[in-house]
A protein has these predicted regions:
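An anion/pyrophosphate-binding glycine-rich loop and adjacent beta-alpha core
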Residues: 234-383, 456
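Conserved small/polar residues in nucleotide/adenosyl-binding loops
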Residues: 486-493
Length: 497
């Protein structure tokens, strides 16, 4: 039987994943004196941070403008009140939010500010203050682009084309500790295995996108929570996934102005026939239906509490019934108004709630058709789809209720260290995100988590040397062999020396 071949490398810190959280962790490590840092990634242009967004992708931070008083404790209370968030983690996310945000400002993420230097916020969902801020639909993409530039300037070692297969562990008293990563270098003509010994592993693989059939996650995002669970890391809040309305030809959240301009919801049979405005069957009058559509703009995630009294999340249930139970197709049509909004064939704004009417009036969006209102309110929203060969002025947009974010994940302490010592899950893979937390907190949590993990490593493990090949094989040889046995294509590849 032949001997299994693999490469071996050592690094003080291995970071698995190259989204906004992982890149920021690498930068924070470098700035705190940890020079031996390696990022393992399937690709720098892959993943959720790089390839997702929304109408106005929000970053949540401590208030930094205006006269409304805010404090770290108040922000922590807001995060904690969302449910399934530990108080110490909420406090850390609030305390470090301004440091994380202004780092992004300093490296060039184009968050808007006024002439006096205030970064003026707005109220996002589940937000009692105005802590939300946005660089536009592509906030997280801008973040990753600037973070990649800074990481390269600082000399962070980035290895592309590696898929993590196993988190390697060793006994540590009654616990375990992470000692490295087994990966597949899959871009070679003949893929080869690589073992990395590490003193610390920062795990930033994002959400479990690959397990969902109907998803707004980018196709390049797969996830790696299962590897950590298999290694013995504890999970937390794993049932708390977030769902919402999204387009499926081009995967994108349909929040904000996409709803506030009051498009027409229609369903058809599988061949495009038997068209119906299906929302009419569930709402008692025009105002309740139009108000639910409007509110869906900033109440985008499905929330069972908002299904009562004809709330906005009733729309999610109705779409689910049409698509999953009735096997029909559902579309948003921006070329026409909902039938219930018409009087004598024209848009009748007197049928709107006062809130919706005031918003449309103040935004200068009182045109006749939804596409015209969208062009007035947010022309970039139209151009985004046009850049993906979808013309909202010429065709309806097919939609579904899609998995969008896992609010749960792996458990960690207030330094983002898991129950496996020297393993730090950060970003979406860490289950800190709660249930009813404000929009934009995930981006803040990812940045804060990277800073916190890097700080702990720099202050406690700076002198810790990574294990060599013999030490890794002695401690985790059986773990490596078991993974190779499962993934190798033939018996002759299943021997390990």
């Amino acid at each position: 039987m032949e001997t299994k071949k693999f490469t071996f490398r050592r690094s003080g810190v291995i970071i698995v994943g190259s989204g906004a959280a992982g890149l920021n962790a690498a930068i924070a490590l470098k700035k705190q004196g940890i020079q031996d840092v390696t990022v393992l990634t399937e690709g720098l242009t892959f993943g959720t941070s790089r390839n997702t967004g929304s109408d106005k992708q929000t970053y949540y931070k401590l208030t930094s403008s205006g006269t409304t008083p805010d404090s770290v404790r108040q922000m922590a209370q807001t995060l904690f009140d969302g449910g399934c968030v530990d108080g110490d983690i909420a406090l850390a996310e609030a305390a470090v939010s301004t440091r994380a945000f202004f780092h992004l400002v300093d490296i060039g993420v184009p968050f808007p500010c006024n002439r006096y230097g205030e970064y003026v916020g707005y109220k996002t969902d589940h937000d009692p203050f105005k802590r939300g801020i946005s660089a536009g639909p592509l906030t997280s993409r801008y973040m990753t682009e600037r973070l990649i530039e800074e990481a390269k300037e600082l000399g962070v070692r980035i290895l592309e084309g590696y898929q993590a297969l196993e988190i390697l562990t060793a006994p540590d008293g009654e616990q375990k500790k992470a000692i490295g990563v087994l990966a597949l270098e899959y871009k070679k003509q003949e893929p080869t295995y690589a073992v990395f010994g590490a003193a610390n592993v920062i795990y930033a693989t994002g959400g479990e996108a690959g397990m969902y059939k109907t998803s707004v996650y980018p196709t390049a995002q797969t996830g790696g929570t299962g590897l950590a669970l298999r290694a013995g890391a504890r999970g937390k809040n794993l049932t708390e996934s977030q769902y919402g309305i999204a387009s499926i030809k081009f995967r994108w959240n349909l929040s904000g102005s996409y709803q506030q301009v009051l498009p027409c919801y229609i369903s058809t049979d599988e061949n495009g026939g038997d068209e119906r405005e299906f929302l009419e069957d569930a709402f008692p009058d025009a105002q309740s239906q139009l108000n639910a559509i409007f509110l869906k703009g900033y109440q985008w995630p499905f929330d069972p509490r908002k299904t009562r009294s004809y709330g906005s999340s009733l729309i999610d249930i109705l779409i689910y019934i049409e698509t999953v139970q009735k096997k029909r197709r559902v579309f948003l049509d921006y070329r026409r108004n909902p039938r219930c909004a018409l009087t004598d064939g024209k848009m009748d704004y007197t049928k709107l709630s006062e809130e919706a009417l005031e918003y449309l009036r103040e935004s200068g969006s009182m045109q006749e058709l939804p596409i015209q209102r969208l062009a007035a309110m947010n022309p970039a929203a139209i151009e985004l789809y046009r850049s993906h060969n979808i013309d909202l002025a010429a065709e309806p947009l097919e939609i579904a209720i899609c998995a969008q974010h896992n609010n749960g994940g792996l458990a960690g302490d207030c330094w983002w260290q898991s129950n496996i010592r020297h393993l730090y899950p950060i970003g979406e893979v860490n289950g800190t995100h709660g249930v009813y937390r404000p929009g934009g907190t995930a981006l803040n949590a990812g940045q804060v988590g990277g800073i916190r993990a890097a700080s702990y490593i720099a202050h406690h493990d700076a002198a810790l040397a990574p294990p060599d090949e013999q030490q890794v094989l002695a401690a985790a040889g059986e773990q490596i062999w078991a993974c190779l046995l499962y993934t190798s294509p033939s018996p002759r590849d299943r021997s390990l020396s």
